[in-house]
Swiss-Prot record:
It comes from Bacillus licheniformis (strain ATCC 14580 / DSM 13 / JCM 2505 / CCUG 7422 / NBRC 12200 / NCIMB 9375 / NCTC 10341 / NRRL NRS-1264 / Gibson 46). The keyword RNA-binding does not apply. Keywords: 4Fe-4S, GTP-binding, Iron, Iron-sulfur, Lyase, Metal-binding, Molybdenum cofactor biosynthesis, Nucleotide-binding, S-adenosyl-L-methionine. This is GTP 3',8-cyclase. One of its GO terms (biological process) is Mo-molybdopterin cofactor biosynthetic process. Monomer and homodimer. The gene is moaA. Disulfide bonds: none annotated. Binds 2 [4Fe-4S] clusters. Binds 1 [4Fe-4S] cluster coordinated with 3 cysteines and an exchangeable S-adenosyl-L-methionine and 1 [4Fe-4S] cluster coordinated with 3 cysteines and the GTP-derived substrate. HAMAP family: MoaA_B. [4Fe-4S] cluster 2 binds at C265, C268, C282. NCBIfam families: moaA, PRK00164.2-1. GO terms for molecular function: 4 iron, 4 sulfur cluster binding; cyclic pyranopterin monophosphate synthase activity; GTP 3',8'-cyclase activity; GTP binding; metal ion binding; S-adenosyl-L-methionine binding. It catalyses: GTP + AH2 + S-adenosyl-L-methionine = (8S)-3',8-cyclo-7,8-dihydroguanosine 5'-triphosphate + 5'-deoxyadenosine + L-methionine + A + H(+).
Length: 341
């Protein structure tokens, strides 16, 4: 933690440690659980360029989160972050902020062959690549654009060659790709990349989520354990979202992100900044706090920091826990493509 920063706790005594920055709401894929093509079509009102925070505005806010509140990790998300022009330039600006330990990016991997080297040289540490199947036809159906698995695998290889750390995320949906659990586990075990299985979540309003479509963490663990024995291991750090497991044969590890069956709200230390400068304190939020207007109206760094601190101190989100207890009130939620995963 930055020794000059303030320890800011929310209503449930959770610190602010992790900032996720969505740099665009656009994507070159149309995955059914995130940006279904029938809704995010040609006429969808994506954010115009003038509404996006500039790189200079993003750098200014990032410095405040790091220096004033002790944020140590920044993850760049979207949409697809590499759809935003000149991303290595932004990475370079963020990497120059004293106090940041880790800069990562979540991407679908398609554009990594073009950008991986430049991103690494600019200061990016690692990427998390989304891939939901190794079956080409199934993956083409899921991504809504007919993009082949080979395009993503090429991106993963480009990232590895560039020296970036690589993890893979797979969203598992019953009746869609649960058959791919073992093939994915075997493939990335052999490749030496950590694969994380993510329970299908009710983020946004357009992915037709229902609990019957969720393949729970316990079921995924059972499927893998019967074929390749695994055991739980300690988290890398306090508040780590993925539950870590290792293969008993010593050939690596996998992870499980279980927002539905085993909520992790009690240790969530993440803030999310949307592409247009709204601050969100939960992935399942209905609305955010408008920082862009404050920036563009001439607010000082101190005034911005006070606003951010007030938002975090008032935070009491625990949507996934409330959902598990059947206490979550139905509401319109912000789309994942807007806020970042």
């Amino acid at each position: 933690m930055n020794t000059n920063s303030e320890q800011v706790l929310d209503q449930k005594s959770r610190p602010l440690r992790d900032l996720r920055i969505s740099v665009t709401d656009r994507c070159n894929l149309r995955c059914t659980y995130c940006m279904p093509a029938e809704i995010f079509g040609q006429d969808y009102p994506f954010l115009p360029k003038g509404e996006l925070l500039s790189f200079e505005e993003l750098e200014r806010l990032a410095k405040l989160f790091v220096h004033q509140f002790g944020v140590e990790k920044i993850r760049l998300t979207g949409g697809e972050p590499l759809m935003r022009k000149d991303m290595p330039e932004l990475v370079g600006k963020l990497a120059g902020i004293k106090g940041i330990r880790d800069i990562a990016m979540t991407t679908n991997g398609v554009l990594l062959p073009v950008y991986a080297d430049k991103l690494k040289k600019a200061g990016l540490k690692r990427v998390t690549v989304s891939l939901d199947s190794l079956d080409d036809e199934r993956f083409k159906s899921i991504n809504g654009r007919g993009v082949s698995v080979s395009k993503v695998l090429a991106g993963i290889e480009a990232a590895k060659k560039a020296g970036l750390g690589v993890k893979i995320n797979m969203v598992v949906q019953k009746g869609v790709n649960e058959k791919d659990i073992l093939p994915m586990a075997r493939y990335f075990k052999e490749k030496g990349h950590i694969l994380r299985f993510i329970e299908f979540m009710d983020v946004g309003n357009t992915n037709e989520w229902n609990r019957q479509s969720v393949v729970a963490k316990a079921d995924i663990i059972r499927i893998i354990n019967e074929d390749m024995p695994i055991e739980p291991i300690d988290p890398n750090y306090e508040g780590e979202v993925a539950k870590r497991y290792r293969y008993l044969d010593g050939s690596g590890e996998i992870g499980f992100i279980s927002s539905v069956s085993d909520a992790f709200c009690t240790t969530c230390n993440r803030a999310r900044l949307s592409a247009k400068g709204e601050l969100f304190t939960c992935l399942f939020a209905s609305s955010g706090f408008d920082l862009r207007t404050l920036i563009r109206s001439g607010q000082t760094d101190q005034e911005l920091a006070e606003a951010i601190g007030t938002v975090w101190r008032n935070r009491d989100d625990q949507y996934s826990l409330d959902r598990a207890l059947a206490k979550a009130v139905p509401r319109k939620k912000v789309e994942m493509s807007y806020i970042g995963g």
